[in-house]
Amino acid sequence: TQYYLENRDRWPVHPVAAAFNAMGLDYFTLGNHDFNFGYEALRDYLRAMDGVCLCANVEDLGGELPIRPWAVHTLANGLRVGITGVVTDFVNVWEQPQNLERLRVTDAFQAALTACSSLRDQCDVRVCIYHGGFEEELETGRVLSDSGENIACKIARELDFDLLLTGHQHMAVEGIELSGTYAVQPP
């Protein structure tokens, strides 16, 4: 992204946005590195995306970002799928303060809880896209971290999502059921 920002005139569209657009994403959430270049870079990236950004724990204090907390998508067969997104709130720990100007990243679990509750009566299936990982070893339950950076197990166990799509740890989770929530994480 830094190279792109320094050479914007070479590309008509942000190259990462172009790749995601080619994939045909309908919905996506923000990741921790999306904040690395400040508000304007994030705004331009999001405006270049064809899909809808869902991130319930990011508040846009500048009013220019196309971010929604959740959406309800009705499939051709009539099934209503409620989708939300959240990003690890450890963005507040890692990110340079100037890159978070005009933004507020709130508690990921509380935002997921609010979204899950709000979607309850609006849809048949609830999905959470969580840019964060698992705080436990999934086979043994051994705690990997209690820092709060990764809370996928807590989300799966305490909230009523049907599907939890995670990403952040760069470890493959091909699929596991946790307290009635099916969870996956790409490598």
Predicted regions: what they are:
Residues 1-187:
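Acidic, metal/ion-coordinating pockets
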